[in-house]
Structure formats: structure tokens, C-alpha cells
């Protein structure tokens, strides 16, 4: 099985390090790419050579908010999981309305997070499995 290409969009360095460690220890083969803000995420995603299987997106980002990234890529057939510290019902509903497949609130149990990511991939498939061309 080829590794899942996951783009993690997270401005908190501690959370990004933890996610890299958790994904590295999971049973899923993963290649994790990290963007530190919304602008960097949009730049990475504008590269036609890069097509992630999943985007894990924080909403509270510097430069360009996660909601803008979410709205821009909702039609790209890439599953997007919002992983945010927001507990605001309106913000959660807006993220789901904009196309997030799942909203996971921080902090969360690590195993629950891994199970959620696995479940999303199983339920929605990867862009490649859904007929979207993938680079490489």
C-alpha cells in the first residue's frame, strides 16, 4: 500500500510535532506534509504536482483563515478534516457546510483521532480512488 499523502495545516508547532509523531506511529503508512498557515497551504495546494489524499485543517490560522482554505478546496474532491480548538456550534456548522467531511475538536484522544482519519479514508476514499488524477 502506498503511503497516504496528508497535508496538515497547523500553526501550532507543538500540535504539528505531535501529529507527525502520532501519524508515524499509526498502522497507516503516511507521508505528512505540514503548512504553518493558510497562505502556505494555498501555495502548496496550488502545485499541480501535489495532490494530497487528505487535508487536516485548523481553522484559526495566521494570514489566511482555515475557512478560506476549506472553501477554496471543497470542490477538489479531497477529503478535508477540520481539527480545531473551536467549540462554537456556528463555526462547526459553517465548516461542515463549507465541505469539511469531519470536525474533530481539540483536545482529543489520539486513538480517537487516528480512528476518525481511518474512518474518513474508508468512507470517502482517496482522490485517486474517486477518479481524480494524482501526481506521481
Report each predicted region and the residues it spans.
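Conserved acidic carboxylate
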Residues: 10
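Active-site residues of response regulator receiver
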Residues: 57-58
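Hydrophobic/aromatic residues positioned on beta-strands within the core alpha/beta folds
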Residues: 83-84
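The feature encodes the CheY-like receiver
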Residues: 62, 88
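C-terminal output helix
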Residues: 90, 108-118
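Short amphipathic alpha-helix used as the core "switch/output" element in two-component signaling
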Residues: 65-78
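Acidic, metal-coordinating helix/loop segments flanking the phosphotransfer/catalytic sites
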Residues: 20, 34-54
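Two-component/phosphorelay signaling modules centered on CheY-like receiver
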Residues: 13-33
